[in-house]
Amino acid sequence: MMNHKFVLLILLIFYCFFLSGCNNSKKTPCSRKHSHKELSKDDPHNLVYKGYYKVGSQYKIKGKTYKPNAPKSFTETGYASWYGGGGDKFHGKKTANGDMFNKNLLTAAHKTLPLPCLVKVTNKTNNKSVILMVNDRGPFKPNRIIDVSAKAAEVLAFKKQGLAKVKIEYLHAETEKFLKNIKVNKSSNKTLAKSSKKPSSTKVANNKCSINCHIKLVNLKYKLAVN
């Protein structure tokens, strides 16, 4: 009887230790159900980042001037729209920094933030949040601060409505780590952006994890659902 209680006590201590390890992890959550294969299901062959790092020069659209920059901190509140519906003309086309737009990935377009970068977008109506990779410019319609992919609109639960009031938070530290993980060199690509040469492609740090997989891993780190 005593031996049985002792075994149960040891098992209980081990279980508590395991839970503590999961909660204190600074990496991704300990859940083993999220394999790299599963997280890469939307872009399994997207192991090479097709774009390059770009801040860009001042530009004008519809009479309004925009000044791209690379801030350390940035927040913005306003309305989000989404693009990438059925027959959408943007799906499969190049973005402002040479990447390829895919409506099924966790991406977004912003007028001034560096490309690519990570932002946390929160739907102010339902408090749903998701971390997205900004890889394009826009939106240029009045009263809209960000365009998100069709998939991101689903996660934020405003796809049917078309618009949602959101808060954007630029994640500077996470962006720096993300750029290293997908092998994007900021210093070398600044010059490439000004030239006619196409930047050379290099595989991501983990060749079992696609670009979208790396975005999802950051979401899981912040305990945000992405499926």
Swiss-Prot record:
Bilayer topology: Lipid-anchor
PROSITE patterns, A to Z: PROKAR_LIPOPROTEIN (PS51257)
EC nos: 4.2.2.-
Entry GO MF terms: lytic endotransglycosylase activity
HAMAP family per UniProt: RlpA (MF_02071)
Known function: Lytic transglycosylase with a strong preference for naked glycan strands that lack stem peptides.
Protein name in the entry: Endolytic peptidoglycan transglycosylase RlpA
Taxonomic lineage of the native organism: Bacteria, Pseudomonadati, Pseudomonadota, Alphaproteobacteria, Rickettsiales
